[in-house]
Regions:
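Long alpha-helical, hydrophobic tracts
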Residues: 12-117, 417
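Conserved mixed alpha/beta catalytic, RNA-binding, or beta-rich assembly cores of soluble enzyme
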Residues: 67, 75, 104-402, 407
Length: 417
């Protein structure tokens, strides 16, 4: 992790949308005043090793014991984490020019198609792209994992041949050390909550939520609950463009709102009960750790990429601390029937404490539950990020642009004008 650059944390233009600065009374004041800190103060404490950092799980009991305002005085940063399937992910690669050069228009990496519609040797490989011929359980996500793990990947590329790019084909092996830039750019990661999937039909369903047994014999969900990044900052008061994050074992940044970003989902206890806000993120693959990146073959569905993402929440005031103290008992998700091709409606709501027991009750029926995301992985992410901050290796960035406060989804019209 020697390549991490804490100095990058101060290069973004600061905003005041996070609140009008209020003088911070410090840790030794005797009067109880409203807690107000700044990014600069927190970063200075990180640099000197004085910052108090806790994970989102750890602060739940602290706030219950001392209240949000007292806890906000004591804690500087809360770390979050999630580790689960994030299909809307991929990597930009610059493969370098051969001699003689080629303008690549058809590109395959380990047999997986990559996009050839960029400049001569730039490409984007999507996580869900399939190997040709399909059926081996390998795809773009596995290519990304292999590259991050330091493995060689077989490149085959062709082009039309032009006066300036005379070559028409090339075949070689590449690794991250051999190519120029390589970075993840994921258009939609870090979903703010998600639904619970079950199956009321008489046949087994194979979905991106896993294998759903007939007649509601099981239900699956996908969230880190208490640790989930966007559930700890539900209205994105501290998360925006330029926020520095833990991405796949390296450092990354929030680059924009994620696709399918919406704010119209009903909230319970201050957080949405279904998929709501999302993030687009970017990071240097050459800094990443293969322990936090996994190519997935989801039976009967296809390929996806599991990624570990952690976001530090600066405790600027008591309201932010109060948001970070949300527990699994407070976070609800809606169960829906995936056997319905459309018009899926909520059957019942359950909180994550109930889901994590391994079973729920629905109209007198006991349903087994399991998670599509890794709670152990989420904890590893949050604790690793905590360790980085405590050792002064990771500073916080104030966003240079806030993400939308309102967002609605549009559906695709079938045959529409």
């Amino acid at each position: 992790m020697d390549e991490r650059r804490p100095d990058l944390a101060i290069q973004f233009i600061p905003l005041t949308y996070l609140g009008i600065p209020i003088p911070y009374r410090g840790r030794t004041g005797t009067e109880r005043e409203k807690v107000a800190k700044t990014y600069e103060e927190i970063n200075n404490r990180i640099k000197t090793g004085e910052a108090v950092v806790m994970t989102a799980e750890e602060v739940v009991d602290l706030v219950r014991e001392k209240g949000a305002e007292r806890a906000a005085e004591e804690v500087d940063v809360v770390t979050t984490g999630t580790f689960g399937a994030m299909c809307s992910s991929g990597a930009f690669l610059n493969l370098g020019h051969a001699d003689p050069p080629i303008r690549m228009t058809n590109i395959r990496l380990n047999g997986v198609e990559a996009y050839g519609g960029l400049a001569a040797v730039d490409t984007y490989i999507g996580a869900t792209s399939l190997i040709d011929p399909p059926g081996t359980g390998y795809g773009g996500a596995h290519v990304i994992e292999d590259l991050i793990a330091g493995k060689k990947v077989h490149l085959v590329a062709t082009g039309p041949g032009t006066d300036c790019y005379v070559r028409k084909s090339i075949e070689t092996n590449i690794s991250l050390d051999d190519i120029n830039e390589a970075y993840l750019y994921n258009p939609r990661n870090c979903y703010q909550n998600y639904g619970i999937a079950t199956n009321t039909s008489d046949r087994t369903l194979y979905t991106y939520m896993g294998k759903l047994l007939p007649r509601m014999k099981n239900a699956t969900y996908s969230s880190a609950g208490t640790l989930s990044p966007l559930l700890n900052d539900p209205h994105l008061d501290t998360i925006g463009m330029g926020t520095r994050i833990f991405l796949a074992g390296g450092e990354g940044y929030v680059s924009w709102q994620g696709t399918q970003f919406k704010t119209t989902v009903e909230e319970v206890n201050g957080v949405p009960v279904g998929g709501s806000r999302t993030l687009a993120v970017i990071g240097d693959m050459k800094q990443m750790d293969p322990k936090f990146v996994r190519g997935l073959d989801i039976t009967g569905y296809g390929i996806s990429l599991a990624i570990g993402i952690g976001i530090p929440i600066p405790i600027l005031n008591a309201d932010i601390m109060r948001n970070c103290a949300i527990s699994d008992e407070d976070i609800y998700a809606e169960m829906v029937d995936y056997s319905l091709p459309s018009g899926r409606k909520c059957m019942q709501r359950y909180n994550y404490a109930q889901l994590r027991t391994g079973k729920i009750e629905y109209e007198g029926k006991t349903i087994r539950t399991s998670s599509m995301s890794s709670l152990a992985g989420a904890r590893k992410v949050a604790n690793t990020l905590k360790d980085w901050i405590e050792h002064g290796e990771f500073l916080l960035n104030e966003p240079c642009l806030s993400l939308p406060k309102e967002g609605k989804l549009k559906g695709l019209k079938d045959g529409g004008q």
